[in-house]
Design a protein with these regions (language model features):
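Alpha/beta enzyme core
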Residues: 24-39, 43-45, 113, 117, ...
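Non-catalytic positions within long, well-ordered alpha-helices that form the structural scaffold/packing
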Residues: 30-31, 107, 185
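Aromatic- and acidic-residue-enriched carbohydrate-binding clefts of CAZyme catalytic domains
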Residues: 1-12, 45-64
């Protein structure tokens, strides 16, 4: 067990006992009637003194292939139960090597869908050459989805992004949430999901916008 700066505990991603434990939970959920098993935090640790981490035991594959190997194993165990298998991923995992073992092009080989968490408040100034990605959520989401489309080119896995419906760094408005939704629709993803940790969502965000409404999300990255 390793703990980050917030005291959150991490288990050893290389340890097959950890794999089996998590997959067993998925199997139990599948047998209870759930039709999709979505794994979150499927990655190596961050947000702490990671130089102090030691991973005991066998490392059957290098870090870059450990998470894909886990997902492949999970699929082998779960697919006979008739469920979809999917994973949540960092929004920037398709744009940079984040050092956490999440590689969309590899992981997407073994899942039915990836759910990138493209929360604009989590992007640093200068990302995608934007002075403040959090100030233009629609454009930020567009760039992120464009990178995921490239990373998953030729894959059958669907892209279903998590969008930001919470305030962080500034107050998010109805227009901010709608701008993200419009960006996703322009890329013809399988759909989207909204996230708010408190479960309090913006009223009217899922209603069609007025025909005259324009938004920054209409800008689609080129190249």
């Amino acid at each position: 067990i390793w703990r980050n700066y917030s005291g959150l505990a991490w288990t050893n991603p290389y340890d097959r006992r950890v794999w089996d434990y998590n997959i067993a939970l998925g199997e139990a959920a599948a047998k209870a009637g759930f039709d999709e098993i979505q794994f979150d935090y499927v990655r190596f640790p961050s947000d702490g003194d990671i130089s102090s981490i030691r991973y005991p035991g066998e490392h059957a594959q290098p870090m870059g292939w450990t998470i894909p190997a886990f997902v492949q194993y999970a699929r082998k165990r779960l697919k006979p139960l008739g469920v979809r298998v999917s994973v949540d991923m960092f929004g920037l995992a398709a744009s940079h090597d984040l050092g956490i073992g999440q590689y969309p092009s590899r992981i997407s080989r073994y899942v039915d869908a990836v759910y990138p968490m493209v929360y604009p408040s989590h992007y640093n100034p200068g990302e995608f050459n934007l002075d403040d990605p959090n100030a233009v959520p629609g454009i930020t989401v567009s760039y992120s989805i464009a990178d995921y489309k490239k990373a998953l080119a030729g894959r059958k896995a669907e892209i279903i992004p998590w969008l930001q419906d919470f305030s962080l760094g500034r107050t998010y408005t109805l227009a901010d949430v709608r701008d993200q939704i419009e960006a996703v629709r322009r890329y013809n993803t399988r759909g989207f999901m909204l996230w708010n940790a408190a479960g309090v969502y913006t009223d009217g965000a899922l209603k069609p916008p007025p025909p005259t409404t324009s938004s920054p999300a209409s800008t689609t990255p080129s190249g």
